[in-house]
Amino acid sequence: GKPEFPAADGKGMMYDNIEDKNEIVRLDAASKTLTATWALSDCESPSGLAIDRAKGRLFPVCDGGKMAVVDTGTGKTIANPAIGEGPDAAGFDPEHQLAFSSNGDGTVSVVDASGADYKTIESVTTEKGARTMAFDPSNGKIYVVTAQFGPRPTATPDNPRPRPSILPDSFVVLVLSR
């Protein structure tokens, strides 16, 4: 499979999305063994992954405008809150109990993780393509990056899905805070 993004629970377990199989795997870091494989029935192409270590919850972000909330002990999906389209990264703020995803449609989706409902509470407008994200828990800031793109090249047999080039001097870092 295609591992996408790991998350550690701080107790010796690692979790990773397997993007092409719509799965999450759990690995024991000390013994270097696979201890569980869980199918994500309502989560297609999971990419980013965040973890709530205290509650034992994983937050994979999925194509189709969904985030899954998964129990780290059982692999059971608890909720599927709505997020923006084209997600890439996930984050979790343990102080404010918020899960979030950065989305290619130019949004950051914010999910309330304080209770059992896991409802989307906000969609913050960023810029189209701002999918790569980092969260700094020391200051509560979210950083997303993007750039402006030129026209998409014509597809060829050797490159059936060409990517457009980035326009010079167009790279930006956007900083989001409460």
Regions found by a protein language model. Give the residues of each.
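Predominantly soluble domains enriched in secretory-pathway, periplasmic, or organellar proteins
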Residues: 1-178
